[in-house]
Amino acid sequence: MDKSISVMLMYLLTHLGLIFFLYPEDIIGSTDSAHWIPIVIGIIVHFVVISIYMKGLSFYPKWDIIRIYLNAGKAAAIIFLLPVTLYFFIIAILAVRAYSEIICIVFLSNTPLWSIMMLLLFVSTYLAAKGIEAIFRTGVLLAIIFLPLISMISFTSFQNINWYYSFPLFEQDFSFLTKPSYFKSFFAFAGGFLFLGFIQPVITYQRKKILLAALFLIPFFIFSVYIPILTFGEATAVTLHFPFVVVVETINISWFMFDRVTMFFLLTLITFSMLFISITLWQANRIISKCLPIIKPFYLLLAISVVIFVSCLMIPDWNSVGNLFLWNTPLRFFVLVSVPLSIYFLGLRFKRKVGHELN
């Protein structure tokens, strides 16, 4: 049964949870003008990557990427699945630690950080244990409830902007390509597309609808960066942590029954982030379960969650989180580039092999 709508919504929600928190600060910090250029480059890379990835997956209609790599040989499985698993661990650790820090700063300043991390990880682990269909059903429900709210807040955040701050529109050079913060910004692209290769054949979808979902994300990539700049100016926006969240704090909606729009905005994004963490845990568990079939997947998932929680406890402060995002850059680009390309070329080889056998 085609479930393209569910996959589209999951693709949107997992990316939105990454875009509004971390992406604006990295892009604003990478250049002092013409921010649309690094944004557009990232979006182009995003579309190229998911197009190649889904084209490669289309050669294997009933296979997930674990089976694809295992079919290619033990060496291919180790070369690609081992870094992917490590990447899942790292992004889960960073997501749990970063989002818990945000919750602690904005809502629960007197609550111990470890308890927030435990709660966030518990909910995500519970969802992952229920399986991919439960995660997707939860995603559809959250999309129905929260996507209109996110859209409303995004558009009402234009109320305090000054278009003068958008100039200059052109950059004399491309120095942002050498800035670590720009490479960190690809976290918003690299973590959210891999699940498309794990859900086959349980959940089927149409490629063009996923591209449509990616197209729908483009305004949010732009808004998340430009609204803080147009509100505060580049010189001020570059000094802010979570600049879009700060902008939301300035929004005044007279007909809204609650005083703090920020609270609902952040709670919405936190629910999206829990979906992202849960699907990341589920993917990591799928790979490890395939390698260790003698251990029940549920116990493996618990072990993964414990490792992630202990790792989060070992991160002392927010600066260390930023350093981990930076140190993770080579692995991030390895996954972003090598997985789609390898799936595509393995798919071409598989197609030729099947064609020869039929002839």
Residue ranges and their predicted role:
Residues 41-52, 85-95, 124, 145-157, ...:
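Selective recognition of specific alpha-helical transmembrane segments in multi-pass small-molecule
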Residues 99, 114, 127-157, 328-340:
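Membrane-interface loop-to-helix entry segments
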Residues 16-113, 122, 334, 338-341:
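Membrane helical hairpin/interfacial module
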Residues 89-96, 128, 145-171, 186, ...:
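Hydrophobic alpha-helical segments and their helix-loop junctions in multi-pass secondary transporters
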Residues 29, 101-104, 121-142, 201-205, ...:
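Membrane-water interface regions at transmembrane-helix termini and the short interhelical loops
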Residues 292-299, 312-334:
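Extracellular/periplasmic helix-loop-helix junctions in multi-pass membrane proteins
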Residues 232-261:
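Membrane-interface interhelical connector segments
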